Amino acid sequence: MDLEKEVRALYLNNRRIKNGFQFTVPSPGTYPYQWLWDSCFHAIVLSHFDPESAKKELLSLLSRQLPDGMVPHVIFWKQGLIRPYEWGWGKDDIGSITQPPMLAYAAWEIHRRAPDGAFLEKIYPQLLAYY
């Protein structure tokens, strides 16, 4: 068994590209959306063998950041499935809550494995707004 090969295959199978953004779904059948915590952990794992995809994972999360800095806990990239947060929230493509902050840690872990000051400079204002 080649664990690294299997992990790479799993991540490739669970990779999605929507509206120009790349992300990883935790489980295509059960959880077909992008989740904040999951994506942060996916990015950390990806940083070991595909740092560019790790960066794209975080950039896709930050693409749906609200003006007040909140990053939603779920992004419904694929419409028409389950949208339990639509009522009372007024947005049909994101969740109405967030999750504990993992974004900066994920960004730092990516940077530790594949130093990229330009990437950190690009996302720093959004991270600051989130925290």
What is each PLM-predicted segment?
Residues 51-114, 118-121, 128-131:
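Helix-terminus loop motifs that line ligand-binding clefts
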Residues 21-40, 47-48, 83-100:
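Solvent-exposed loop and edge beta-strand segments that line ligand/cofactor-binding
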Residues 1-34, 52-56, 60, 69-71:
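Low-complexity, Ser/Thr/Pro/Gly-enriched N-terminal "stalk/linker" regions
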Residues 39, 43-46, 107, 127:
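Hydrophobic core/packing positions within alpha-helical solenoid repeats
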